[in-house]
């Protein structure tokens, strides 16, 4: 939830796997369910580092925390919409409940058009979500000439692979 628009949805202890056994009402319980197990901090350093990196990535990219709702259209005639949805094919999202795939491309040129943000153009950012229990592929959209996709390895599991754009699959 750190890379979605709006307020990041993270609760104390989430950064090291303190799940409260899935109980979303643990705040009103004065027992082990609601207590923070600080031992998890030393057991789950990898998750903590991942969360720290995700926070830094979000801070570095203003297009990921816009002060206004994204529209999904190219309302400033920049050549791309502010946000677009993708699936197994670039620019085509399957809305079937069995798909369980979502690719989102944010266009950073819109970040600099907002009055309350610094005047610095952000990157194209593509975030792929696979909610399926099996490995699935997403397609990358083409970028403008002279640009290419780069991956942030920190956010990829060892099973995932990524290819260059041009409708190729990741």
Residue ranges and their predicted role:
Residues 2-170:
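Carbohydrate-interacting/catalytic domains
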């Amino acid at each position: 939830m750190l890379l979605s628009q709006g307020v990041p949805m993270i609760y104390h202890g989430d950064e090291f796997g303190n799940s409260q056994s899935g109980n979303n009402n643990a705040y009103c319980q004065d027992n082990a369910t609601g207590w923070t197990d600080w031992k998890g901090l030393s057991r789950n350093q990898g998750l903590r580092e991942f969360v720290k990196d995700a926070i830094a990535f979000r801070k570095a990219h203003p297009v990921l925390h816009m002060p206004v709702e994204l529209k999904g259209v190219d309302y400033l005639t920049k050549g791309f919409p502010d946000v677009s949805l993708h699936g197994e094919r670039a620019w085509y999202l399957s809305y079937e409940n069995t798909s369980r795939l979502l690719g989102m491309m944010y266009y950073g040129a819109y970040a600099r058009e907002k009055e309350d943000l610094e005047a610095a153009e952000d990157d194209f950012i593509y975030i792929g979500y696979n909610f399926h229990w099996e490995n699935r592929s997403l397609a990358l959209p083409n970028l403008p000439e002279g640009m290419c996709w780069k991956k942030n390895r920190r956010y990829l599991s060892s099973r995932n692979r990524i290819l260059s754009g041009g409708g190729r699959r990741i």
